[in-house]
Amino acid sequence: MDHDTGATLLFDLEGVAVSRVYRDADGMRVVELVTTDETATACPSCGSFSSRSKERVVTRPRDLPHGGSPVDIRWVKRRWECREVRCERGTFTEQVSQIPARARLTGRLREACGQAVVDGGRTVIQAGRDLGVSWPVVMQATRDHAEQVLPATLPTTEAIGIDEIRRGRAVWRELPDGKWELVADPWHIGFVDATGGQGLFGQVEGRTSASVQKWLAEQPGHWPRFVSGERALSCSAGCP
């Protein structure tokens, strides 16, 4: 299929090409994509390449803003039939590294969410607002990015800062004895380097001194010794 080479170069998303760019009735820029990655025709179950296309489908993954404003992505891709008789998968749709199957965000947008919090020092709420993504999505992206970039052993610090974040409402469930149990606490505690320079150390659900003490106890044996006793005490006392 023909595509706009200049627009594809500018859009720069691996595995796809821009076939058309236009504005819809509301003035939103619409970017139509087609697949260029030949491996997208391989069955994700058995790996065999298909040569029989069943239909075209359109998905609308969200991407980074372009030119300072969001764009509406419409990826026109094919549904293929797997002809391998030993494979239980009948059909599959194309996927590329930046847009896996059933993904609602491009990989680079998800990565930008994590970088904004872990590397950029923005709160989850602020990063979500800036990038147009919901709190849960940014939070998961933050966890994923942190696992990739944070060292296995936490760097030492003399002071820990606590950042309390609230998301949504508490979720409760009723137990057989009529009592209620908290299933999801809306409050989370983030542990950061209060001396500056080392960013986020970790995050736990809850908003109590017990949550702080539990997190400290789970750290490597050598690590809490570097935290000033006076500062650690004030840190725990600061939690209700």
Annotate the PLM regions.
Residues 120, 131, 184, 231-232:
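Active-site-proximal structural scaffolding
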Residues 1-87:
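Short, conserved DNA-binding cores of transcription-related domains
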Residues 43-44, 92-95, 202:
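Short, charged, solvent-exposed linker or helix-capping segments at domain edges/interfaces
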Residues 31, 43, 82, 127, ...:
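Short, conserved catalytic/metal-binding motifs centered on acidic residues
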Residues 72-84, 88-162, 171:
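Extended interfacial segments that mediate partner engagement and assembly in macromolecular machines
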Residues 42, 121, 222-226:
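Short loop/turn motifs at secondary-structure junctions
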Residues 92, 239-240:
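Short acidic (Asp/Glu) and glycine-rich catalytic loops that position anionic groups and cofactors
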Residues 137, 141-229, 235-237:
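RNase H-like nuclease fold core
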